[in-house]
Amino acid sequence: MVLNYIWIAFFLIAFVVALAKLVIGGDTTVFTEIINSSFASAKTGFEISLGLTGILSLWLGIMKIGEKGGMIQAFARLASPVFSKLFPGIPKDHPVTGSIFMNLSANLLGLDNAATPMGLKAMQQLQELNEGKKDTASNPMIMFLCINASGLTLIPITIMMYRAQLGAANPSDVFLPIMLATFTSTLVAILAVCIQQRINILQKNLLLFFGGLSAFIGGLIWLFNSLEQEQVSLYSTLFSNTLLFTIICGFIVSGVRKKLNVYDAFIEGAKEGFQTAITIIPYLIAVLVGIGVFRASGAMDFIIEGVRMGVAAIGLDTEFVGALPTMLMKPLSGSGARGMMLDAMNTYGADSFVGRLSSIVQGSCDTTFYVVALYYGSVGIRNTRYTVPCALLADLAGAIAAVTLTYLFFQQA
């Protein structure tokens, strides 16, 4: 229901703002821009779905081989001690645990093209376990979606690449703040859902997991700081893609050992990928059109200016307001937030306070509404329950952490 209200609000707020701009400001092009944006967003939604078709077919084919070869079940057993606590509604050693593990691992490595199909496969398996209404999100679905929307990634290669292209003296100087901000976002997402689902977060396995993850991130930060920027990009890309292809070959070998017809198993999974891509089209178009209309009306500009005036009125520093477009756009549109980040770096400079803050915000979380539309749309979920509020709370935590860390690390820069 929350997503329904937000979607309606996109259109009604856009209409009110556009009408005010027409009547008061004399802007005769605003409604034309809104309509053009709705058409362009619908086209973009279809093109994204079309682009996902090949990737989904590839990875769901690979996942089917791994499932029949027993590799997914092996991953499920590996992740069971932690996931059984975070996802108590999933039976022990169920294949979906392995799919979730694969998805989160791919996200950590920044392998988006692999993570999305794995996540959609996990959603299909979670839907099979959904004992309630099939159009209503289950508890494990909500936990899975919120962790995904928090966007935990170990090495933000793309952001550092953009900073290098725009002339940053040290493109990797945002690595540590991004790591801390996205860890904060993920932690808040998990805590929010645990509170809603009354999951005891003080269980031994969970405490060991978060402690181990914190130690691992600390070690990675130490290693990162000892390497040059070019070495970081080289080694992280090499490691990620080598690991990914090793997993693919491991799946194939597992199928051979089980004496499967590996080719037929791949085709079976690839067919599921094609069907999934078709299923998500209307959900993706609905969300992207709503966001596009909201942006084109100029409503976001009014929000940003209102925040700037409010912050100034209470005597706080307003330097961070220059990055607000990226903060507000991030939950709505990944490409939009990326454009806002690049615009901030072009306008203020890649090494400016705003340029760095925009980069940190971009890496602090994922695109909530896109993730919700894509993943829930793939299994026909309409009632998302408290998914969106928890995910947006994580986005807010990530944004606050990004601002705080930028002041801490770069205010005197």
Predicted regions and their residues:
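Hydrophobic alpha-helical context, especially transmembrane and signal-peptide helices
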Residues: 5, 33, 45, 94, ...
